[in-house]
From Swiss-Prot:
PANTHER family given in the database record: ENT-COPALYL DIPHOSPHATE SYNTHASE, CHLOROPLASTIC, ENT-KAUR-16-ENE SYNTHASE, CHLOROPLASTIC
Protein name, entry field: Kaurene synthase like 2, chloroplastic
Organism: Isodon rubescens
Cofactor: Mg(2+)
Transit peptide feature, positions: 1-28
Listed pathway(s): Secondary metabolite biosynthesis; terpenoid biosynthesis
Motif DDXXD motif, residue numbers: 538-542
GO terms classed as biological process: ent-kaurene metabolic process; gibberellin biosynthetic process; terpenoid biosynthetic process
Similarity comment: Belongs to the terpene synthase family.
A Pfam family of this chain: Terpene_synth_C
Length: 752
């Protein structure tokens, strides 16, 4: 088994949680918390944090959008064009101006000045339209004049459609006789950018132009074809679930469905509306995704199950909230698939195609959307998902371009994208993935459309705080277990076997990465000890051991109840067998308590199977025999040594594994798929060394067996084997995720 891990990541220093804005800077604290007298207060804080997070499942909080609220405030009454339809919005604008004269979101990012300018000007227009708030208008105009240079500043984030909408609102301001004293050069630059944007749109395909102009309808003025805009009206009466666009449409057309949507939003939110409504499905999926990626989902399993069930119902119903938004569709597809729900890729790939054709123009795509689509496209489970493969390749190219062009302004997001491209979800151990998420986590996860908006479900310091504390708790347990493993290694005298690789640190790291939860200590120790032993036995058969020693070890395991002082042919065999027997008995005793039946004989049989196959490989090498590729794979997927490492641990993770389950074809299929993938990956990497040493190797044998009269090139053979690995990996993932007789938590271990 060839897994590359950073040992320090799993048994090294802990994360500091006192300062959590950048968790990656907090890897310098030891075990103080585990022994601190403040443990009680830490535990209380831990539970309080869990409680706050749990409440998010029952209330979807969205930040107020001053921009959208201003546009809703401009809507006239359906019975009188001289009166506002939503006076509560006007009152909210009057009462919520900032001290500097702007209408900015609290604690907004310093790179969102364009957003603040746009929102402030929209609020000014709303107040002026209805002849109220003279003082607020004056202060707002002063803010716009003072900060007008930011409208063309390159370092600022540009909201969707800003270069068209903001100049249009300036025109409206002049039409309302608002006296704005604007710097001429900046104003000319802004007008030039607007004309350039309009020209670029006119040169794009008509469908993309049409949907983009519909999204920014409030900024198009006389250029807007309102009848074409209404093609995008949704069942809830909105245009793109956007209060501002829908408000502009009602002002232009007096469409009753638009008005009903606005009434619905006001009834839900009161006097101010968000930038997007509804956003319930996406918001809840973001919450689930955050908890899963940060490794704390197990604390909220009931709530998460409810979200997944609701989302699946919406998926089956073809809910617009999922399928009319690429990010929501991608997140739903990935989350549902990875949690075992049956969702085909057809609907998702259509959403991706729409994203890159007409439904979501390039003006509106951001890196977060592309990244979300890319992550979803990785979840390929079936051999015939050709379109999903194509979209995966396309999305990868787009993200690579974003990285190489340096267009990603956030260093944290840049690191997340790079990590996603470097490590497919299946190529990084779960514990390592959680650590990376903590390191790169930003809890101020602001989203940008025509204006900025956020929700505590998008990013939240409580998520990070709970994750860091949980990580540290697990780390403390892992360190204690590692000390126990170190002691065991020496007590069993395995450290005296100088020919063997001293791999117990590596072995424990793979165990901790596979079973992070504190309660799975027995499974971790079983995995780690058997991993150490299989490495030593492998070295005995491959490097040091004589034929007599190999045969003797096999005989000892077959007989089992033997006197090691008289029946071992060498000191090395005595040490190995003694450690092996005591470890199997220890695991058997622990397994008996959980399973209610003896599992020792099965563990012995697993070990014997490996030893027999290792002996066969040893004989091939000794006799310089060349097996066929089929003969080799039949033996080598067992001799890879994963059986003794993985299979005994299944008995220790909690659920009962009956004899019928262990004998079931699915159990054996899971093992064969996992071990075959690992064997092929290992043989590709170790090709040169094993060929030089005269040992059978899958890549070498495949070159001979598949090349006809001429040996296949190494590169071509690697490509063929990688395709085979990918097919096997998909089948393995599919088998793990599908409902079956084997408990899910046991099946998931085969995917580690």
């Amino acid at each position: 088994m060839s897994l590359l891990l950073s040992n320090s990541a799993l048994v090294g220093p802990k994360f500091r949680s006192s300062r959590i804005s950048h968790a990656s800077a907090s890897l310098d604290i030891g075990l103080q918390r585990a022994t601190s007298p403040q443990n009680a207060s830490v535990a209380t804080c831990f539970e309080e944090t869990k409680g706050r997070i749990a409440k998010l499942f029952h209330k979807n909080e969205l930040s107020v959008s001053t921009y959208d609220t201003a546009w809703v405030a401009m809507v006239p009454s359906p019975t009188s064009s001289e009166e506002p339809c939503f006076p509560a919005c006007l009152n909210w604008l009057l009462e919520n101006q900032c001290h500097d004269g702007s209408w900015a979101r609290p604690h907004h990012h310093h790179m969102l000045k364009k957003d603040v300018l746009s929102s402030t000007l929209a609020c000014i227009l709303a107040l002026k339209k209805w002849g109220v708030g003279e003082e607020q208008i004056s202060r707002g105009l002063h803010f716009v004049e003072l900060n007008f240079a930011s409208a063309t500043e390159k370092g600022q984030i540009t909201p969707m459609g800003f270069d068209i909408i903001f100049p249009a609102m300036l025109d409206n301001a002049r039409g309302l006789s608002l006296n704005l004293q604007l710097e001429p050069t900046t104003l000319n630059d802004l007008i030039y950018k607007r004309d350039l944007e309009l020209k670029r749109c006119n040169q794009s395909n008509s469908a993309e132009k049409e949907v983009y102009w519909a999204h920014i309808a409030e900024g198009m003025g006389k250029l807007q074809d309102w009848e074409s805009v209404m093609k995008y009206q949704r069942k809830n009466g909105s245009l793109f679930n956007s209060p501002s666009t829908t408000a502009a449409a009602f002002i232009a057309l007096r469409n009753s469905d638009c008005l009903n949507y606005l009434y619905s939003a006001m009834n839900k939110f009161g006097s101010a509306v968000p930038a997007v409504y509804p956003l319930d499905i996406y918001s809840q999926l973001c919450l689930v995704d955050n908890l899963e990626r940060l490794g704390i989902s197990r604390f909220f399993s009931t709530e998460i199950q409810s979200v997944l069930d609701d989302t699946y119902r919406c998926w089956l119903d073809g809910d617009e909230e999922i399928f009319m938004d690429a990010s929501t569709c991608a997140l739903a597809f990935r989350t549902l698939r990875m949690n075992g729900y049956s969702v085909t890729s057809d609907s998702f790939t259509k959403a991706v195609q729409d994203c890159f054709s007409s439904s979501i123009p390039s003006h509106m795509r951001d890196v977060n959307t592309t990244l979300e689509l890319y992550r979803a496209s990785e979840i390929m489970l079936y051999p015939d998902e050709i379109e999903l493969e194509k979209q995966h390749s396309r999305l990868r190219s787009l993200l690579e371009h974003e990285l190489s062009s340096g267009s990603i302004q956030s260093s944290q997001l840049n690191a997340v994208v790079k990590h996603a491209l470097d490590y497919p979800f299946y190529a990084i151990l779960d514990r390592m993935a959680k650590k990376k998420t903590i390191e790169h986590y930003e809890f101020d996860d602001t989203r940008i459309l025509k204006t900025s908006f956020c929700s505590p479900t998008f990013g939240n310091k409580d998520f990070l705080s709970l994750s860091v504390e949980d990580y540290n708790r697990c780390q403390a347990i892992h360190r204690k277990e590692f000390r126990e493993l170190d002691r065991w290694f020496k007590e069993t005298k395995l450290d005296e076997l100088k020919f063997a690789r001293q791999k117990y640190t590596y072995s424990y790291c793979t165990a901790a990465a596979s079973f992070a939860s504190p309660e799975l200590s027995d499974a971790r120790m079983s995995w780690a000890k058997n991993s150490v032993l299989i490495g030593i036995v492998d070295d005995l058969f491959d490097v040091k051991g004589s034929v007599e020693e190999k045969q003797n070890l096999i005989k000892l395991v077959e007989l089992w109840d033997v006197d090691v002082s008289t029946q071992c042919c060498s000191q090395s065999v005595q040490i190995i067998f003694s450690a092996l027997r005591s470890t199997i008995c220890e695991i058997g005793d622990k397994g008996f308590k959980i399973q209610g039946r003896s599992i020792t004989d099965h563990i012995i049989a697993i070990w014997l199977d490996v030893l027999y196959n290792m002996m066969k490989e040893s004989e091939w090498a000794e006799n310089k025999s060349v097996p066929t590729i089929d003969e080799y794979m039949k033996i080598s997927h067992v001799s890879s040594g994963l059986g003794p490492v993985v299979l005994p641990s299944l008995y220790l993770v909690g659920p009962k594994l009956s004899q019928e389950m262990v004998n079931h074809s699915e159990y054996h299929s899971l093992f064969k798929l996992m071990s075959t993938c690992c064997r092929l990956l290992n043989d590709i990497r170790s090709y040169e060394r094993e060929v030089e040493g005269g040992k059978p190797n899958a890549l070498a044998l495949y070159r001979v067996s598949s090349g006809g009269e001429m040996m296949m090139s190494k590169e071509a053979a690697i490509s063929e084997l990688e395709r085979l690995i990918e097919r096997q990996r998909r089948e393995l993932m599919r088998t793990i995720l599908e409902e079956s007789v084997i408990p899910k938590c046991c099946k998931e271990i085969f995917g580690h």
